[in-house]
């Protein structure tokens, strides 16, 4: 059984830890926390060994948490590391620790692409991560983009160019110091936003431009996409592609899905941990084909969309399973929607 160490136990790290714990071919060797807060105590209650930085050992002991060791001890106890640190900290960890230990590491999309050898999305380029030392799972928005575009391309729908407009959530639900509160902020004001070039690190030949604004919500991002297709395709063919592809959910207005809030409420009603929705929620009614032009809207749950990607990245790097077997295994273990999906 593969031993996975999680560096960072915040919004993404704690979700990845729970996902690893749900697998039958990997287990948590431990998690790294810098602060002995409630999340650290929850990690202990979950049965995870908690590690910290060398200068934090006494701080944890005073808080009543006996650390299992330092970050170097965690790396030594692991076959692979998933670094879910805040933005840019992953690169610092690489230079300070990971290079020395020469073990594979999965980074997150908050890091620049050059931190890793490969930027990763399971549907798009699973095989490229095989045997790599450093792999980066792209950000939530980029994961949403690459997943939607890959869904079409895997089903024979060719894309000439993509123009995607993103309404980014202003903050995660627990982030009390971020915003905006009463504003719409170009994020960035320049074109393109970083999401398009980031998507090109995975889908290297795609012609894509993105624009983004930050809006005063916390639940999800909304993408509005215009795609120019290379050929003539029907609306039915596009919808069938989404219906068959794993990690895509078709939300119907007639079934009560009129907003992103209702997507999250659906996740809660399903009993999903933390109300997570790792699937991309494509609004079926928005899918419109006009000649070779395709229009659609879809929601991206920023807290959870990358979680299954990280599990697949571990398998891809270590060669634990081929692409479709890994994706199916991950989806079933995390209780994602698998009915009607085609794995292969």
Swiss-Prot record:
Keyword NADP: yes
Binding site for D-glyceraldehyde 3-phosphate: 139-141, 195-196
Keyword Zinc: no
Active site: 140 (nucleophile)
GO biological process: glycolytic process; lysine biosynthetic process via diaminopimelate
Residues at which NAD(+) binds: 11-12, 110, 169, 302
Gene Ontology annotations for the cellular component aspect, listed alphabetically: cytoplasm
InterPro entries, sorted: DapB_N, GlycerAld/Erythrose_P_DH, GlycerAld_3-P_DH_AS, GlycerAld_3-P_DH_cat, GlycerAld_3-P_DH_NAD(P)-bd, Glyceraldehyde-3-P_DH_2_arc, NAD(P)-bd_dom_sf, Rhodanese-like_dom
SMART domains tied to this protein: Gp_dh_N
SUPFAM superfamilies for this protein: Glyceraldehyde-3-phosphate dehydrogenase-like, C-terminal domain, NAD(P)-binding Rossmann-fold domains
Involved pathway(s): Carbohydrate degradation; glycolysis; pyruvate from D-glyceraldehyde 3-phosphate: step 1/5
Gene Ontology molecular functions: 4-hydroxy-tetrahydrodipicolinate reductase; glyceraldehyde-3-phosphate dehydrogenase (NAD+) (phosphorylating) activity; glyceraldehyde-3-phosphate dehydrogenase (NADP+) (phosphorylating) activity; NAD binding; NADP binding
Broadest EC class assigned to this enzyme: oxidoreductase
Predominant place of localization: cytoplasm
Quaternary context: Homotetramer.
Family: Belongs to the glyceraldehyde-3-phosphate dehydrogenase family.
Entry keyword set: Cytoplasm, Glycolysis, NAD, NADP, Oxidoreductase
Subcellular location: Cytoplasm
EC number assigned by the record: 1.2.1.59
Catalytic activity from the UniProt record: D-glyceraldehyde 3-phosphate + phosphate + NADP(+) = (2R)-3-phospho-glyceroyl phosphate + NADPH + H(+); D-glyceraldehyde 3-phosphate + phosphate + NAD(+) = (2R)-3-phospho-glyceroyl phosphate + NADH + H(+)
Identification of the protein by name: Glyceraldehyde-3-phosphate dehydrogenase
Coiled coil start-end: none
């Amino acid at each position: 059984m593969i031993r996975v160490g999680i560096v960072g136990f915040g919004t993404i790290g704690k979700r990845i830890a729970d996902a690893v714990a749900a697998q039958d071919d990997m287990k948590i060797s431990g998690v790294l926390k810098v602060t002995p807060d409630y999340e650290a105590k929850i990690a202990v209650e979950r049965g995870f060994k908690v590690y910290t930085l060398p200068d934090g050992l006494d701080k944890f002991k005073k808080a009543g948490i006996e650390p299992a060791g330092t970050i170097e001890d965690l790396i030594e106890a692991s076959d692979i590391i998933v670094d879910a640190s805040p933005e840019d900290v992953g690169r610092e960890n690489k230079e300070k620790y990971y290079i020395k230990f020469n073990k594979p590491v999965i980074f997150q999309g908050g890091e620049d692409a050059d931190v890793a050898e490969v930027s990763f999305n399971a549907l798009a380029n699973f095989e490229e991560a095989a045997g790599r030392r450093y792999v980066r799972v792209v950000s939530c928005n980029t994961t949403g983009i690459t997943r939607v575009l890959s869904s079409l391309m895997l089903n024979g729908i060719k894309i000439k160019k993509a123009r995607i407009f993103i309404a980014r959530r202003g903050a995660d639900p627990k982030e009390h110091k971020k915003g905006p509160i009463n504003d719409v902020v170009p994020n960035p004001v320049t074109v393109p936003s970083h999401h398009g070039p980031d998507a090109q690190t995975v889908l290297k030949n795609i012609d894509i431009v993105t624009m983004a604004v930050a809006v005063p919500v916390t639940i999800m991002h909304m993408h509005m996409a215009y795609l120019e297709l290379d050929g003539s395709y029907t609306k039915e063919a596009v919808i069938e592609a989404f219906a068959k592809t794993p990690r895509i959910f078709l939300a119907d207005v007639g079934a009560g899905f009129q907003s992103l809030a209702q997507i999250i409420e659906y996740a809660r009603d399903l009993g999903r941990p933390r109300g997570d929705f790792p699937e991309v929620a494509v609004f079926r009614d928005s899918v419109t084909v006009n000649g070779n032009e395709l229009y659609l809207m879809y929601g991206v749950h920023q807290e959870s969309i990358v979680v299954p990607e990280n599990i697949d990245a571990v398998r891809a790097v270590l060669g634990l399973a081929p692409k479709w077997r890994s994706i199916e295994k991950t989806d079933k273990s995390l209780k994602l929607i698998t009915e009607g999906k085609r794995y292969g």
